[in-house]
């Protein structure tokens, strides 16, 4: 742990000595990478959640066909909520890319 702290302190001096233009370009590049990774993970999680929701709805309808209509309604509500989370991740990614508060 002490080695990591010393390494971070040593690197901090280099970061503070860097030119502002270089820091801004590096921050832009890291913002693009972070937005891509974050949006990719959100889409992956959303796809897994939607697949599980659809599978559970199909299984429920197969067990009790009389509840198919209610299950479909509940499934569509759940899918909308799952998709909303992915859209929130997209909004955060757009903020990181175009309205980054850390860029001067």
Swiss-Prot record:
One of its GO terms (cellular component) is proton-transporting two-sector ATPase complex, proton-transporting domain. The chain crosses the membrane at residues 31-51, 75-95. It is a multi-pass membrane protein. Its main location: membrane. It comes from the Bacteria. The record marks 83 as: Reversibly protonated during proton transport. Keywords: ATP synthesis, Cell inner membrane, Cell membrane, CF(0), Hydrogen ion transport, Ion transport, Lipid-binding, Membrane, Transmembrane, Transmembrane helix, Transport. One of its GO terms (molecular function) is proton-transporting ATP synthase activity, rotational mechanism. The keyword Coiled coil does not apply. It is found in: Cell inner membrane. Pfam families: ATP-synt_C (PF00137). InterPro entries: ATP_synth_csu_bac/chlpt, ATP_synth_F0_csu, ATP_synth_F0_csu_DDCD_BS, ATP_synth_F0_csu_sf, ATPase_proteolipid_c-like_dom, F/V-ATP_Csub_sf. F-type ATPases have 2 components, F(1) - the catalytic core - and F(0) - the membrane proton channel. F(1) has five subunits: alpha(3), beta(3), gamma(1), delta(1), epsilon(1). F(0) has three main subunits: a(1), b(2) and c(10-14). The alpha and beta chains form an alternating ring which encloses part of the gamma chain. F(1) is attached to F(0) by a central stalk formed by the gamma and epsilon chains, while a peripheral stalk is formed by the delta and b chains. Belongs to the ATPase C chain family. F(1)F(0) ATP synthase produces ATP from ADP in the presence of a proton or sodium gradient. F-type ATPases consist of two structural domains, F(1) containing the extramembraneous catalytic core and F(0) containing the membrane proton channel, linked together by a central stalk and a peripheral stalk. During catalysis, ATP synthesis in the catalytic domain of F(1) is coupled via a rotary mechanism of the central stalk subunits to proton translocation. Key component of the F(0) channel; it plays a direct role in translocation across the membrane. A homomeric c-ring of between 10-14 subunits forms the central stalk rotor element with the F(1) delta and epsilon subunits. This is ATP synthase subunit c. It comes from Aliarcobacter butzleri (strain RM4018) (Arcobacter butzleri). The gene is atpE.
């Amino acid at each position: 742990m002490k080695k990591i702290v010393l390494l971070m302190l040593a690197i901090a001096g280099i970061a503070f000595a860097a030119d502002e233009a270089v820091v801004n370009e590096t921050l832009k590049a890291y913002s693009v990478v972070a937005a891509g990774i974050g949006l990719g993970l959100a889409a992956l999680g959303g796809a897994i959640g939607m697949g599980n929701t659809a599978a559970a709805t199909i299984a429920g309808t197969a067990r009790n066909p009389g509840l198919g209509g209610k299950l479909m309604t509940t499934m569509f509500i759940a899918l909308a909520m799952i998709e909303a989370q992915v859209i929130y991740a997209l909004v955060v990614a757009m903020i990181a890319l175009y309205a980054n508060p850390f860029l001067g």
